[in-house]
Amino acid sequence: MMKIELAVNGTLMRGLALNHNLLELGAVFVEESITAPCYRLWSINDQYPAMQRCSKGGQISLEIWRIDPSNIGELLGREPAGLSVGKILLADNRQVLGILGESYLCEGKREITQFGGWRKYKESSESEGSNFRSDSALTSNKNRS
């Protein structure tokens, strides 16, 4: 059965709250990677990130997973409104499908591009003792990426 590569950059990553959504659909971890330096990342209410391509941005850490293309719709159905699947350019010039955020979702939200990824943002937020919601608070909610 043919599988495709899918880049994820938020709570779907290994060890995070919604990674089980990938595992339940038979996805297999391939590698850690980073985007080309043309992406921006926002925190959506400290619950999940939204990434967008732009002309000038930064490199964002992500994970590449192999998944059956027939399961993409199911996975996307578990994601919140405003997240979708699109093409992502990696630092090594490969292009893969991945989770992206629509512009309306990011309006008025905190930009976290400077952290280089969701994990680093989360670690920084927790070490600062902020009101960051932990992934355990999201475990029961299947509607976040």
Which stretches of residues belong to each language-model region?
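Glycine-aromatic micro-motifs
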Residues: M2-N141, S145
